[in-house]
Structure formats: C-alpha cells, structure tokens
C-alpha cells in the first residue's frame, strides 16, 4: 500500500492567505465596515460580505503627522474609541498582526511605548502572532539588519 501525505486536505489543491493592513484606514466606521465585509455575509457599504476569515493589523500609537487609527490617542495613554473594538478583534483572532508599536513617521519611538503595549496585551492575555516591520526610516522600532532598525538592539535608546 502506497500512502502519502497530501499538501492540502482533500479535495483542495492549493491555498490562499489574505491579510488586511490598518495603514491609511480612513475612519473607525470604514475599518469596522471593511472587517464586516471581509469576514461576514452581512450587507455592508461595500456590498454583501464575502464570508472569509481575514485578519488585520493594529497600532498602539500614532506618532505621524497624518490621521491613523490606533489603540491610544497619538502618543498618550488615553484609549481611542477603536481600543475596545481592537480588543474584540484580538479576542476573535480577526486581528492577528501588530503593526509594530505604532506609526512613528516623525520618529520619537521610546521603549516605554512598547512597555505600555505589552501591559495591554498582558492585561487581556492577548497573543499577537504576527509582527509587521515596515515604515519609513524614522520608525526605529523596526527589527532587522538594515540601517535605522534598532528594535532588537538593547543598547539603542529606542
């Protein structure tokens, strides 16, 4: 008998993974509507929902000059209206990506921001399995072996 393990469960021959990204989400309402469109079959402003299982990302802080949805208001510890929604999506696993600790397009990242983010994750017992690591060069919290990536350098001030 010749038994083999298939790459994909029968009857499937391939797979596709889709992840949305909070970058430039225009408003709290549009973010929620888009998540509903992707993950339900409800009628949405985008049309009937697709009924998929699509994850998304979030930031704890917004240190950029542009409007960005985040857990905290700007660089403060004050929760936004999105914070409880983020917690709901983290609990349901519809948010599975930490878009680094925040958008720091103006620079200014400090380890205290990461500590505050960890406080929230620990308080609610959330595990975020994916880390998004992109951003302009002033986002020093990025991790890697390229210039301006200091997130894993314990000797750097960020």
Where are these regions (language model features)?
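Catalytic alpha-helical scaffold of carbohydrate-active enzymes acting on polysaccharides/glycoconjugates
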Residues: 1-158
